[in-house]
A protein has these predicted regions:
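Subtilisin-like serine protease catalytic core
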Residues: 18-142, 156-159, 186-188, 212-216, ...
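Substrate-binding/access-modulating region of protease and related hydrolase catalytic domains
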Residues: 23-25, 125-215, 226, 239-244, ...
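Extracellular S/T/G-rich loop segment that most often corresponds to the catalytic His/Ser-adjacent loop
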Residues: 59-77, 208-282
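Hydrolase catalytic cores
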Residues: 98-102, 128-129, 159, 250-313, ...
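C-terminal subdomain of the subtilisin-like protease fold in secreted/lumenal serine endopeptidases
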Residues: 249, 286-363, 422-448
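Surface-exposed binding patches on compact interaction domains or structured appendages
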Residues: 309-311, 327-340, 362-398, 505-510
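Noncatalytic accessory or regulatory domains flanking protease catalytic cores in secreted, cell-surface
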Residues: 403, 507-574
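Acidic, Ser/Thr/Pro-rich low-complexity intrinsically disordered segments
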Residues: 468-531
Length: 680
């Protein structure tokens, strides 16, 4: 086990002239997270001078080391600490992350002396995650709050921002946080983002937003120590909707010792890997203050070290370009644009072409030999490149797809003498099998019937994400499929379906895909699983599937089953643009003890989710049951007199929502009412 942030593995201490006394000096790293504890000894301000124009935000939460302290609570936030830059009850994650990036050099921690990657850098504290979650994930925040934090960090003059946070990707053109990160990069700030920790549950295509941002440096995690390998949890590309090749690089992310509000602790995750790279970016900017964010990203990716594994390579969808090597990134020689190549989905027996502009990054001009090293490709598929490229110049890649399906993965390798530089590449050769010829078009929301019996069984696997066996939803659906079609002629907030009834023996499940292609799921929202981290049902099965903030276009709603024996009849509700919670009205506020309080509920959209119903009387949980269009709240055991009823309920769209919607819990209704209980 290593002590503290693992700067040695990423060769941060091998930079020419680098010492712990000056590493990162003058560079400002913004931590967009759940609030940094500026009082921690890892951020001791002794020996620092507050830079001109600072502090900013809440001065009481700043020091000469932590020079900005801001909070971004959502409108109407009820949590008592939501507006404070540090939450004494819930904050913790940001303090650990900030220590990895920029904790002071040679700080005593659990008997060892540890240092952040860029120990002399300043820290900006941007608390965008301010709301506690019922699912136990800690503080959270939605897109508007995270975007506000990004914009504030840019305005405050941060050089690097670190976001060790994430949510499932939505339609890229409508992803507010990812677009804000691209804008930050355009404004001169280096954005670094954690890749996520979903690989073991969701497999390939599990890397979400805002790591999906094109101009961000997205970071996966390796094990720590002298022989790093990809951490099992580290999320995998491609990004599920945009099909970008991510992550960009990897860095140590297991058992990292760093600061916690109560002292010190070990944590694992891509949340720990990202600040290693944020610190690395700070070191490079200290040495190359004229480098733009794209130059920092290119330097870190083109010089990264490929990782070995049992099958000969970790693969670019897990490792990106490889393990960060800060010393090599100091002299990248060449700068590829883009830094990685995604062919996306390529139909079998077709030709797909991509190009990379290779710029001179200083000392790289002239001829370089070009080769392609593939870690995998389906039979008959090949990638051709010219034997050389003259820098600066254009490098053209042709992917000639064969007849077989499968992923193409590897790297373009540029060589000159003993030097080499790498550009990762990925694509998938596909032969879509879904039969959409008889698909019924749904023209309006409502309740519909279906039956998969007697229909073709052509599709077994849906992607992306490509859920592995043993994941939280069924990985293989080998039964027959029934397909319905939806044409979105305008942008909507959402659409989806929920199975309301299954016939005897029916085990049908919904999936939603784009343009008749089972390889184009609408991301996590397409899976019958609770997606909302603010509620208890997060991660639990739910018979619903949908699309969040989808682009206009054609979508297919597919009902499938694990086996042919699970085919059968079903009924489902289809909704579109559901942004309001159910309505709830108490029928009678005075009842006899033992008789239920009846609350009439209606929902014209996705329908009431029975699992969401929670009731308390005088603050104590009581039984509440949905019967038809009424919720019946038990009065058993209540004393005669006046009582306070609190009822909470949501619809099925709430199970599809995540942090990329503009309000927290927009489809949840919470009502309070006084009730009077009489003698029986």
């Amino acid at each position: 086990m290593l002590a503290g942030p693992d700067a040695d593995t990423i060769r941060a201490r091998q930079l020419p002239g680098a010492t712990l006394a000056n590493a990162g000096a003058g560079i400002k790293i913004g931590i967009i997270d759940d609030g940094v504890d500026q009082r921690h000894p890892f951020f001791d301000p002794s020996g620092y001078t507050m830079p001109a124009g600072f502090p900013r935000g809440r001065a009481a939460y700043t020091t000469a080391k932590v020079i900005v302290a801001r909070a971004f609570p959502p409108p109407g936030a009820a949590w008592k600490h939501a507006g404070a830059p540090y939450d004494p009850e819930e904050s913790g994650h940001a303090t650990h992350v900030a220590g990895i990036a920029a904790g002071n050099a040679n700080t005593l921690a659990n008997g060892a002396r540890i240092s952040g990657v860029a120990p002399r850098a300043y820290i900006g504290n941007y608390k965008a995650l301010t709301v506690p979650t019922e699912s136990g994930l800690g503080l959270n925040g939605n897109a508007p709050e995270i975007v506000a934090a990004i914009e504030a960090a840019v305005a405050d003059g941060m050089d690097v921002i670190n976001l060790s946070l994430g949510e499932p990707e939505i339609e890229p053109s409508r992803d507010l946080v990812a677009l804000a990160l691209d804008a930050a990069a355009a404004a001169g700030v280096v954005p670094v983002v954690a890749a996520g920790n979903d690989f073991e549950d969701f497999g390939r295509g599990s890397l979400g937003s805002p790591g999906s941002a094109a101009d961000a440096i997205t970071v996966g995690a390796t094990t720590s120590g002298p022989s790093p390998a990809i951490a099992g949890f580290s999320s995998s590309g491609p990004t599920p909707l945009s099909l970008r090749l991510k992550p960009d690089v990897v860095a140590p992310g297991t058992s990292i010792l760093s600061s916690r509000p109560d002292g010190w602790g070990l944590s694992s995750g891509t949340s720990m890997a990202a600040p290693h790279v944020a610190g690395a970016a700070a070191l490079l900017l200290q040495r190359h203050p004229d480098w733009a964010p794209a130059q920092v990203k290119a330097a870190l990716t083109v010089t990264a070290r490929p990782l070995a594994s049992a099958d000969g390579g970790a693969g670019p969808t897990r490792s990106g370009a490889g393990l960060v090597d800060v010393s090599a990134a100091d002299t990248p020689l060449v700068r590829p644009v883009p830094t990685g190549v995604s062919f996306g989905l390529v139909r079998a027996d077709t030709l797909s072409t991509r190009s990379v502009t290779v710029e001179d990054a200083g000392g790289g001009a002239g001829a370089w030999n070009v080769a392609v090293e593939l870690s995998g490709a389906p039979l008959g598929t090949r990638i051709s490149v010219p034997p050389t490229v003259s820098v600066p110049g254009l490098l053209v890649l042709d992917l000639l797809a064969g007849a077989a399906e499968g992923e193409v993965a590897g790297a373009i390798v540029l060589r000159r003498d003993a030097l080499s530089r790498r550009i990762p590449l990925w694509g998938r050769v596909e032969v879509p099998k879904l039969d959409v010829s008889g698909a019924r078009t749904l023209v309006r929301p409502g309740v519909y019937a279906g039956d998969t019996r007697g229909r073709p069984a052509l599709v077994t696997t849906y992607r992306y994400p490509e859920v592995p066996p043993g994941g939280p939803v069924t990985a293989r659906l080998a039964g027959p499929e029934q397909v319905f079609r939806v044409r979105m002629r305008r942008p909507v907030a959402n659409f989806g379906v929920v199975i309301t009834q299954r016939g005897p023996g029916s085990r049908v499940e919904p999936r939603i895909v784009r343009a008749g292609d089972e390889n184009r799921l609408t991301g996590y929202a397409a899976l019958p699983l609770g997606q909302n981290p603010y509620v208890d049902e997060f991660g639990s099965p739910v018979p619903a599937a949908g699309a969040l903030r989808p682009a206009p276009g054609v979508y297919e709603i597919v009902f499938d089953s694990p086996t042919a024996a699970g085919a059968g009849a079903f009924r489902f509700r289809f909704w579109m643009d559901d942004v309001t919670p159910p309505r709830a009205t108490v029928v009678r506020r005075t009842v006899r003890r033992g008789d239920p309080v009846r609350v009439r509920v209606t929902d014209a959209g996705s329908g009431v989710d029975v699992r969401s119903i929670e009731a308390t009387v005088d603050g104590k949980p009581v039984r509440a049951q949905l019967v038809g269009d009424e919720i019946r709240v038990s009065t058993t055991g209540l004393e005669r007199g006046r009582h306070s009823l609190r009822l909470s309920l949501a619809d099925y769209q709430e199970t599809r929502n995540n942090e990329n919607v503009t309000r927290i819990l927009p489809n949840t209704r919470t009502m309070t009412s006084w009730i009077t209980v009489l003698r029986p």
